[in-house]
């Protein structure tokens, strides 16, 4: 694996452990040239799932897009990147197990909200505000009431 700091081609693995219900492996590596340390994740390649958007368009599932949406909701919140990775890994595992080659974007949004609810309520409301397309203060207040009552 190429070092992201100096570009040297050889690294050694310092630590390797399964993560996310055993669906991926986290490896801690060290560059043999500059001794910089970095983390990599290895996961098996999944079948291509298509997302059905609200307007009916279809596009290929993009892990980065899902990660970025969750990262934005969790910005400046006490939610680690590892927790966000775990959310995405859990959702991907559910998608794989469903056996469906297509899924509605609303189902993925519901899965994200379900997981964020137990991790960080502010991130949950932030994500919901974009996903549910809140247009006014009443929409926010309704989401907060529902969160408090659950």
Curated annotation (Swiss-Prot):
TM spans (from-to): none
Positions annotated as zinc finger (unnamed): 3-34
Keyword Transcription in annotation: yes
Pfam family, one: Zn_ribbon_NrdR
Domain of life: Bacteria
This protein's record includes keyword Amino-acid biosynthesis: no
Cofactor dependency: Zn(2+)
GO molecular function: ATP binding; DNA binding; zinc ion binding
Entry's cofactor comment: Binds 1 zinc ion.
InterPro entries: ATP-cone_dom, NrdR-like_N, RNR_NrdR-like
Domain ATP-cone: 49-139
Alphabetical keyword list: ATP-binding, DNA-binding, Metal-binding, Nucleotide-binding, Repressor, Transcription, Transcription regulation, Zinc, Zinc-finger
GO biological process, one term: negative regulation of DNA-templated transcription
NCBIfam families per the UniProt record, alphabetical: transcriptional regulator NrdR
Family of this protein: Belongs to the NrdR family.
Role, per record: Negatively regulates transcription of bacterial ribonucleotide reductase nrd genes and operons by binding to NrdR-boxes.
The protein's name: Transcriptional repressor NrdR
Organism of provenance: Petrotoga mobilis (strain DSM 10674 / SJ95)
């Amino acid at each position: 694996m190429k070092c992201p700091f100096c570009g040297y081609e050889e690294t050694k693995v310092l630590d390797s452990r399964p993560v996310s219900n055993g669906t991926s492996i986290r490896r801690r590596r060290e560059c043999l040239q500059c001794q910089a340390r970095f983390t990599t994740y290895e996961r098996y390649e999944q079948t291509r799932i298509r997302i059905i958007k609200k307007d009916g368009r279809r596009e290929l599932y993009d892990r980065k897009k899902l990660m970025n949406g969750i990262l934005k909701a969790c910005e400046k919140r006490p939610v680690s990147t590892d927790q966000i990775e775990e959310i995405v890994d859990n959702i991907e595992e559910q998608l794989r197990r469903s056996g469906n080659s297509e899924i509605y974007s609303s189902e993925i949004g519901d899965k994200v909200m379900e997981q964020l609810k137990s991790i960080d309520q502010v991130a949950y409301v932030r994500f919901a505000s974009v996903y549910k397309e809140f247009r006014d203060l009443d929409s926010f207040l309704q989401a907060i009431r529902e969160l408090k009552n659950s």
